[in-house]
Amino acid sequence: MARKVLGKISLQIAAGKATPAPPVGPALGQYGVNIMGFCKEYNARTANQAGYIVPVEITVFEDRSFTFVIKSPPASDLLKKAANIDKGSGEPNKKKIGKVPRAKLLEIAETKKEDLNASDIEAAVKMIEGTARSMGLEIVD
């Protein structure tokens, strides 16, 4: 018999740095989940992605057990790392703050293709390209 789902929680946590402090503690605490158990497992599974914010989708069951799925880091995070910038431009159409080679966009699209709503890799690259433009990044060949 399938376990009954009590709730689904979506969080964005720094890889390898989950602690019982907010936002993790309050989000899991309201379902009575073992917070430390989640933190240890999450930190172990994301240790290789240090420096990124990693989205996670947690499913909590009626018996207070849980499972979680780790997604790929947000495109904006990957683009910031690729362009060596701290944040996007406040005026993306007027002020360009960095350059990203098209090859790097392809690499980012490959990383994110599982989470993107794209039929093929070219469509995924166009999505990443749009994100780069809206951050004030210039795409170079």
From Swiss-Prot:
What post-translational changes are documented for it? One or more lysine residues are methylated.
Query: Record's SMART domains?
Result: RL11
**Top-level lineage group:** Bacteria
Presence of keyword Ribonucleoprotein: yes
This entry's Gene Ontology molecular function terms read: large ribosomal subunit rRNA binding; structural constituent of ribosome
GO terms under cellular component:
cytosolic large ribosomal subunit
Q: Which residues are connected by disulfide bridges in this protein? A: none
Q: What does this protein do?
A: Forms part of the ribosomal stalk which helps the ribosome interact with GTP-bound translation factors.
Q: Which NCBIfam families match?
A: L11_bact (TIGR01632)
Q: What HAMAP family does the annotation carry? A: Ribosomal_uL11
Q: What is this protein called?
A: Large ribosomal subunit protein uL11
Origin organism of this chain? Syntrophomonas wolfei subsp. wolfei (strain DSM 2245B / Goettingen)
Its gene is rplK
